[in-house]
Amino acid sequence: MHDIRVIRENPAAFDEGLAKRGLEPLSAELIALDDARKAAISAAQGAQERRNALSKEIGAAKKAKDEARAQDLMAEVARLKDEAPALEAAADAAAKALDARLAAIPNTPKAEVPLGRDEHDNVEYRRFEGRGRAEAGRQHFELGEATGLMDFEAAAKLSGARFVVLKGHLARLERALGQFMLDLHTTEHGYTEVAPPLLVRDEVMFGTAQLPKFRDDQFAAMPGSVEAEGGAPTRWLIPTAEVPLTNLVRESILSEDELPLRFTALTPCFRAEAGAAGRDTRGMLRQHQFTKVELVSVTTPEQSDEEHERMLASAEAVLKKLDLPYRVVTLCTGDMGFASQKTYDIEVWLPGQGTFREISSCSVCGDFQARRMDARFRRREGRGVAHVHTLNGSGVAVGRALIAVMENYQNPDGSVTVPSALVPYMGGITRIEGPHA
């Protein structure tokens, strides 16, 4: 969420940032809301100060035995007391109106982010050729269904569209990928493993900016009794472990010496994919439930840019060790996520589609999420308290890594060679094949 004080100090810069995202200027509207908030607070405080002053005058009038004046003053105090709840409610409503408007506005991009409208304007940052890009091959779902180890029909009977049942060695390969990634990030990249809850509160989803903007993309979980009565949801299934990991520092004041903090988690993720109708309808690319290793960093403002590059390198290391070809692109202003100041996407090569597809997204959010969470740190040597910066990235999406391994390591007979980095996690299995695997 944006700081209204910063907007007031430089409204033109704020509007320029919005324009880069294709949005109309909003500084004047926000400043007007803030003026209304200040006026409402001033009115409530002024009435309270007047009551306090009149109370002293009542005492003086009684001391002077001026009963008539004392009665008049007491009547005025009573009137002000009656008006106080309405004035306080008006001040509260004005503050909430400003906060609600600020909460609906996306983060503004860093100066170096390329201008653009959509994914076609993203800029390649670097690439890794790995084992080389095969120009043709079967898609993952063709390979999976041929082996009998990837069952979309069974999943549809259980849960509907956009789910999958993995079996045998293919299920083990997905598990191996997740464990491999966690081990890499915790032993080589300095991340602390966390096993977070998968159900979180409204305020936690608000903190990372999933709510209120992306409410329709989420799955709400509620007790059956509440659902039957038409009540409001009490918990949300996490769309990414970014949500609980980032909120570990909500409503806290850290010491500068604690930073940076680095967390990682392997969790299921749940997304309604409300805007994905007709896209990637076959296969595992776009699922309502998928597994992902998440990376989250909490830093000082001075550390966040360097940490962004470090996080990107950590995610890239997964694909390098798997020898998978990929490229990194810097997202343009029109393609960035709501909370992001700058985002790198890692796109892995999929021979079955003959194209690169996103497998990781690494973003720096500045203090945008920290303000929503009230997450701060105390600077050394008494230099005050400031909001932390937050970063998040996929390290990486396990289901899409499985797709990439299947398509890049496929053999002419339809079997899949297990990458050497995963063989220890597969109990020595080097090839996945056949309906009985």
Swiss-Prot record:
Family: Belongs to the class-II aminoacyl-tRNA synthetase family. Type-1 seryl-tRNA synthetase subfamily.
Record-linked NCBIfam families: serS
Major enzyme class: ligase
Catalytic activity as recorded in UniProt: tRNA(Ser) + L-serine + ATP = L-seryl-tRNA(Ser) + AMP + diphosphate + H(+); tRNA(Sec) + L-serine + ATP = L-seryl-tRNA(Sec) + AMP + diphosphate + H(+)
GO terms assigned for molecular function: ATP binding; serine-tRNA ligase activity
EC number: 6.1.1.11
Gene3D superfamilies (UniProt xref): Bira Bifunctional Protein, Domain 2, Serine-tRNA synthetase, tRNA binding domain
Subunit composition and interactions: Homodimer. The tRNA molecule binds across the dimer.
GO process annotations (BP): selenocysteine biosynthetic process; seryl-tRNA aminoacylation
Location in the cell: Cytoplasm
Descriptive protein name: Serine--tRNA ligase
Comment text on domains: Consists of two distinct domains, a catalytic core and a N-terminal extension that is involved in tRNA binding.
InterPro entries in UniProt: aa-tRNA-synt_IIb, aa-tRNA-synth_II, aa-tRNA-synth_II/BPL/LPL, Ser-tRNA-ligase_type_1, Ser-tRNA-synth_1_N, SerRS_1_N_sf, SerRS_core, tRNA-bd_arm
Function: Catalyzes the attachment of serine to tRNA(Ser). Is also able to aminoacylate tRNA(Sec) with serine, to form the misacylated tRNA L-seryl-tRNA(Sec), which will be further converted into selenocysteinyl-tRNA(Sec).
Binding site for ATP: R271, A272, E273, E358, I359, S360, S361
Matching PANTHER family: SERINE--TRNA LIGASE, SERYL-TRNA SYNTHETASE
Recorded GO CC terms: cytoplasm
